[in-house]
Amino acid sequence: GAIYGFIGRNGAGKTTCMRMIGGLAKPTSGEISMFGYAGKDLSKVRSRVGCLIEAPGVYPNMTAKENIEMKCRLFGISKKGYAEGILDRVGLLNVGKKKTKNFSLGMKQRLGIGMALVGEPDLLVLDEPINGLDPQGIAEVRDTIQNLCAQQDMTVFISSHILEELSKLATDYGIINNGALLQEITREELLSKCSEKITLTVDNPNKAVPVLDKMGFVHYMIVDKNHIDVYERLNDSAALN
């Protein structure tokens, strides 16, 4: 599964966009299309979308399992062991009868992700799930998302204003500002823009690559028919020349 990182400063429009995708807000103009459906027909595929928008909507005096079971009842799911399976996927299977009001913020976020997984969605929408977490909580949520993508054929749409953290997760990125999508780039393109590098100007990249390989260079990328970006041994410019 792919992880699409939605980047923008606070107030850029990330949450509003995600609320519209989740059916929690209506667009004032334009059109939303998902899974080949648009407009009023979106109701046919809303069940294929799981959302965690802003704070997790959990019952504080219930356990993690009870919260998942409540969501299951709303979805008409009565399969035995289903709630336990969800909790296992988000790393909360062994929290026992601990009330969610006593959970850490990271645990609450993972429970929120678990509740969004009820119904086995094809698209998981996560609105700044690492916002406000300590380093351990960030790592736990990141591991949960990565494990879900590795185990299931699921697309994750995740927003954040922390580019450094999203760079450890996402495979593709969209950059938004003032409600407008400015750019879409791949992870490789993002790393290229953010990394220190030396750009080589060559006549033929296909002839230059074997030379780089022979010299022991591994981290490089062909940009176009006349340029190669090199990301290692930057102080070794004499050898590159």
Residue ranges of model-derived segments:
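Conserved ABC transporter NBD signature motif
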Residues: G30-K40, K44-V45
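ABC transporter nucleotide-binding domain
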Residues: R142-E232
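Catalytic Walker B motif of ABC-type/P-loop ATPase nucleotide-binding domains
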Residues: L124-E128
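Conserved catalytic motifs of ABC-family nucleotide-binding domains
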Residues: E120
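Conserved ABC ATPase "signature" region
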Residues: E69, R73, K80-V95
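Helix-to-loop junction immediately C-terminal to a conserved catalytic motif
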Residues: G22
